[in-house]
A protein has these predicted regions:
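The feature captures the beta-strand-to-loop junction immediately N-terminal to the Walker
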Residues: 37-39
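Helix-to-loop junction immediately C-terminal to a conserved catalytic motif
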Residues: 52
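Conserved ABC transporter NBD signature motif
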Residues: 60-67, 113
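ABC ATPase NBD coupling module
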Residues: 68-83, 227
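Q-loop/switch helix immediately C-terminal to the Walker
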Residues: 88, 94-110
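Walker B catalytic motif
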Residues: 162-163
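Conserved beta-strand-loop-alpha-helix hinge in the C-terminal portion
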Residues: 213-236
Length: 244
C-alpha cells in the first residue's frame, strides 16, 4: 500500500514562499485505480513527481508497505516497482522498440515475451518490435509503448501524468481500453492525473486536488456532481486540456 503522510512542497523565490503541495495525506491500496483531478496549477503533477522521486518534498513522508521511501532515489523507487509515465514520453532515435523493452525488463527478453507486452497494450508486435522509438511513431503509439515498458518492468505502482495529452481521439480510445484492461487484471496499482471523464469513470476512487490540497475524495458517483458544478476561469474542470 502507498501512504502519503502530510506531504508538502514549498518553493521559495524573490517574491516569497509558495505552497505547491500542502499537507496531503492519502492511502492507496494495492490493486486500486486512483484518479487525481482538479484545476490546472493545483499541484497534481507535482504530487505525482513527489511520489516518483522526481521532486523532493519539504515536509511529510511517503511510505510503501510501511517502509519510508521519502529519502530514496528515483532508481531505488523504480527497483521497488514504482514507474512513471510522462505527459510527453521521450523518443530515442536509433533505439528499437525491442531494445527499449529489454532495457525496461532488465534482462534479455525472448521474442514471445517482448511480443506479449506489446499485445497487452493493443499493438501488433510484428509491426513494432523492429521500429525505432522516434518521430515516425504517433503520440498514441509512443504512449502505449511506454505502458508496455512499465509492464516489462513488472511495475506494481504505475503513475500516469495526463496520458490523454497530445493524442487524437482514436488513440485516446485505445489508451482508455488499455488502462481498463490493466485495472481489470488487478496486478497493478494505478494512479492517473487526468481531467477526462472517460478515465475518471473507470477509477475506484477520485481525489480532487486544488491549491495544493485535497478538496474532495470519493467514488465517481459521489464526486462527479461536485466536479461538474465547479468551474475554473469559466471552464469546467473536466474540459479537455482546460480549453473553454
Amino acid at each position: 500500500m502507498l501512504t502519503l503522510k502530510n506531504l508538502s512542497l514549498t518553493a521559495s523565490d524573490a517574491q516569497g514562499r509558495t505552497d505547491i503541495v500542502k499537507n496531503v495525506s492519502l492511502d492507496v491500496e494495492d490493486g486500486k485505480f486512483l484518479v487525481i483531478t482538479g484545476p490546472n496549477g493545483g499541484g497534481k503533477t507535482t504530487l505525482a513527481k513527489l511520489i516518483m522521486g522526481l521532486a523532493t518534498p519539504t515536509g511529510g513522508q511517503i511510505l510503501l508497505d510501511g517502509e519510508d521511501i521519502t529519502p530514496l532515489s528515483i532508481t531505488d523507487r523504480a527497483r521497488r516497482g514504482i514507474s512513471y509515465s510522462f505527459q510527453q514520453p521521450p523518443r530515442f532515435k536509433g533505439m528499437k522498440v525491442s531494445d527499449l523493452l529489454t532495457i525496461a525488463a532488465g534482462k534479455t527478453l525472448s521474442h514471445d515475451e517482448a511480443c506479449s507486452y506489446l499485445t497487452q497494450v493493443g499493438l501488433c508486435a510484428r509491426d513494432y518490435l523492429g521500429r525505432d522509438v522516434d518521430t515516425s511513431l504517433s503520440g498514441g503509439e509512443v504512449k502505449r509503448i511506454e505502458i508496455a515498458t512499465l509492464l516489462a518492468k513488472n511495475s506494481r505502482l504505475m503513475i500516469f501524468d495526463e496520458p490523454e495529452a497530445g493524442i487524437d481521439l482514436w488513440s485516446f480510445a485505445r489508451l482508455t481500453e488499455t488502462v481498463r484492461d490493466l485495472h481489470e487484471k488487478g496486478r497493478h496499482t494505478i494512479i492517473i492525473i487526468s481531467h477526462q471523464e472517460r478515465i475518471i469513470r473507470l477509477a475506484d476512487e477520485i481525489v480532487l486536488l486544488a491549491n495544493g490540497e485535497i478538496a474532495g475524495r470519493g467514488t465517481a458517483d459521489e464526486l462527479y456532481p461536485k466536479l461538474l458544478s465547479q468551474t475554473v476561469a469559466g471552464c469546467n474542470l473536466l474540459e479537455v486540456n482546460g480549453i473553454c
